[in-house]
Amino acid sequence: MPRGLELLIAQTILQGFDAQYGRFLEVTSGAQQRFEQADWHAVQQAMKSRIHLYDHHVGLVVEQLRCITDGKSTDADFLLRVKEHYTRLLPDYPRFEIAESFFNSVYCRLFDHRSLTPERLFIFSSQPERRFRTIPRPLAKDFFPDHGWETLLMRMLSDLPLRLPWQNKSRDIRYIIAHLTETLGEDALPRCHVQVANELFYRNKAAWLVGKLTTPDGTLPFLLPIHRTDEGELFVDTCLTTTAEASIVFGFARSYFMVYAPLPAALVEWLREILPGKTTAELYMAIGCQKHAKTESYREYLCYLTESDEKFIEAPGIRGMVMLVFTLPGFDRVFKIIKDKFAPQKEMSAAHVRACYQLVKEHDRVGRMADTQEFENFVLDKRQIDPALMALLRQEVPEKITDLGEHIVIRHLYIERRMVPLNIWLEQVEGQQLRDAIEEYGNAIRQLAAANIFPGDMLFKNFGVTRHGRVVFYDYDEICYMTEVNFRDIPPARYPEDELASEPWYSVSPGDVFPEEFRHWLCADPRIGPLFEEMHADLFRADYWRALQTRIKEGHVEDVYAYRRRQRFSVRYGAISSTANSS
């Protein structure tokens, strides 16, 4: 290869990333217009399009590089020089951290995820000590109650870029002050002030004002979800001021925010104070930089390995029929491998399972489906694998592992947030905790269905409980769109003997689902059955599911709230006009 080509390749990769992030910002910048026009289907399409941008631009760069090198193979020294040139381009580059991840992606695409070493890739950042020397403009604006909180909030809401009229701004301000007074106390409120991000965070059918509430005792989140009525008038739906509430809003089971962030690292640092429980990976994920979040997630995993002497073990819970799941006892993630052979009742292919996981990545997860990161050629040190797990790997996934002596390479796996399996949780709790868990499970089913997702296998073992007590679905091999399912009532038995027969007396076609049958396995436990019948009996009726299908087919997009219904101002303080119920 001629000298000088290394720099050209490095520049080509960085220019490719520039193009990708430019398009990322372009799609993001349309969020305000989509919100103002209530174009909810465009919101969903933009979310999918933005996710696809990254891989699309990686592919474009790879094709460019193949043209530049004329398809000739490149030796290791040549690639090291390319990385050296690329590293020299980054010190003055505003998005250096994501540019490093983009370089990694291009390399992996070129070399089919082989030879993934720190020398060739940015496994760790080339500039870990660097922070933001200059920010072109402030990320946030401060508001002080010099003339009282009513004036402060009036200025804050009037300062928003939204061009729609308010339904009743004075009312919303009264509600916010009432909440803050209840939370902080009347004496403390005058000594507090707010810092608000310049950019709104858009997701689903809401525009979130995200801020920091500085009190005499510390800093709290200050989150206002702003909605629009069918008539195009704005209203504030609630005010959230605890770290737990903020953590749920920015949770791993939710779709990525659309927030205009030309300097994503600066925004991540700004968010860290009000989301202290979130890792760097989770913060990048929340603002839509999911590929760099994968890089950060892998770095967090490597750091954990260096600080721990734990061994990988099979994950607790009922063993899956499609996925082999393992973990580290103290790590908050699980590793999931698609088995070489599935249980006989699972009539599907590995390609189908991967397609289901991709569907979840692109779909609105409504706070009820865990996000995943996908890895290829994942290396594990044999010394860190428990012998029982090693035997299980050789038994269940021999075609997906390569033995390199001291290490094994797993051809493909997913990493996902670790949760307590719901079936285990239900065995351990009672009283109000049991009631809350059953309510959460039913709500998860309803919200998934309203978002056009049918879980397929709704057994408790396929759901997990987060640290905030939320129930989240994580077994995706049987999911499908609601509109693909035929919900049927079980026909009346022709004869008494029919109900005792081992085979049904009625025909069953692919895609047929009989909600009445859910009762047999959801209500078998006498502790659970009465609670389920009380709160979610309509889930056993086919007409409930068919009514949801009708709404979906008619184009309705349901509201998705990242907080309890009882927290809405309309429930707490008074009735917001019924026109606020969007269709």
Swiss-Prot record:
It comes from Salmonella heidelberg (strain SL476). Its EC number is 2.7.11.5, 3.1.3.-. It holds the Pfam family AceK_regulatory. InterPro entries: AceK_kinase, AceK_regulatory, Isocitrate_DH_AceK. HAMAP family: AceK. GO terms for molecular function: [isocitrate dehydrogenase (NADP+)] kinase activity; AMP binding; ATP binding; phosphoprotein phosphatase activity; protein serine/threonine kinase activity. This is Isocitrate dehydrogenase kinase/phosphatase. The lineage of its organism: Bacteria, Pseudomonadati, Pseudomonadota, Gammaproteobacteria, Enterobacterales. Keywords: ATP-binding, Cytoplasm, Glyoxylate bypass, Hydrolase, Kinase, Nucleotide-binding, Protein phosphatase, Serine/threonine-protein kinase, Transferase, Tricarboxylic acid cycle. The keyword ATP-binding applies. The gene is aceK. Its main location: cytoplasm. The keyword Coiled coil does not apply. GO terms for biological process: glucose metabolic process; glyoxylate cycle; tricarboxylic acid cycle. The active site is at 371.
